[in-house]
Amino acid sequence: SKWMPNSEDVMGWNVKNSGLHVVFSKSIPVIISKWLGPFIHEFLNRYDLHPAQIENFVAHPGGKKVLQAYEEALQLTTEHTTISRDILKAHGNMSSPTVLYVLEQFMLKRNEPNTYGLLVALGPGFSGEAVLLEWRE
């Protein structure tokens, strides 16, 4: 888990009498491109891993530009983000639960044993969450 200081205006919710109103800054893809790489490298270093060892990238698909920013920041191919793109196309950005729809599709497909996956979601405040996954026999 990592939070970016002074980023309350990047992503979140405004609570008004008329209900919840989402806050999405247009700078999110640029922030991801610069901020996500160091965060994920630091996270993977704790496990003596590097991004090239990640077979399955389970990403919350905030939007097409967000997925492109993931690819740029972590040197991923579009193959890594295909399932996230498919979920985005079928359901849109459903907020927090969206990454669980992506995870479900990874769990349903045949994965090679003894491979690693990385679940990544971004959220309000601007924050990032990462979970290391391992597929076993």
Q: What residues fall within each predicted segment?
A:
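Condensing-enzyme catalytic core mediating Claisen C-C bond formation in acyl metabolism
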Residues: 1-34, 38-42, 122, 134-137
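Membrane-interfacial loop- and helix-cap regions that link adjacent transmembrane helices
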Residues: 17, 42-46, 53, 73-75
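Short, structured coil/loop segments at alpha-helix boundaries
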Residues: 25-26, 47, 63
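Claisen-condensing/thiolase-fold acyl-transfer catalytic domains that form or cleave C-C bonds
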Residues: 33, 37, 51, 55-137
